[in-house]
């Protein structure tokens, strides 16, 4: 499974949404119904899954599915 698909599975599982709703511009809060705690838990899940630390200042900039895919692809080169 590629990284993008795994990211989408984590989001779908945590937020209880269908993977096909996870377009790159889908916003976690506005489009996918996440609250601030959900977003924190998502960041923690990405950190655990990909064995990476995401600083708070970076996490605050991650607002969409595309943001997290681009961020992780950049950090995990």
UniProtKB/Swiss-Prot annotation:
Highest rank taxon of the organism: Bacteria
Membrane-crossing segments per the record: none
Carrier domain residues: 1-76
GO MF entries: acyl binding; acyl carrier activity
Subcellular location: Cytoplasm
Entry-linked InterPro entries: ACP, ACP-like_sf, PP-bd_ACP, Ppantetheine_attach_site
UniProt keyword Cell membrane, yes or no: no
Residue positions where O-(pantetheine 4'-phosphoryl)serine is found in the record: 36
A biological-process GO annotation: lipid A biosynthetic process
GO annotation, cellular component aspect: cytosol; membrane
Main location: cytoplasm
Pathway: Lipid metabolism; fatty acid biosynthesis
A Pfam family the protein falls into: PP-binding
PROSITE patterns in UniProt: CARRIER (PS50075), PHOSPHOPANTETHEINE (PS00012)
Sorted UniProt keywords: Cytoplasm, Fatty acid biosynthesis, Fatty acid metabolism, Lipid biosynthesis, Lipid metabolism, Phosphopantetheine, Phosphoprotein
Transmembrane helix found in the keyword field: no
PTM text: 4'-phosphopantetheine is transferred from CoA to a specific serine of apo-ACP by AcpS. This modification is essential for activity because fatty acids are bound in thioester linkage to the sulfhydryl of the prosthetic group.
Family statement drawn from the similarity comment of this UniProt entry: Belongs to the acyl carrier protein (ACP) family.
HAMAP family per the UniProt record, alphabetical: Acyl_carrier
Function: Carrier of the growing fatty acid chain in fatty acid biosynthesis.
Full protein name: Acyl carrier protein
Gene coding for it: acpP
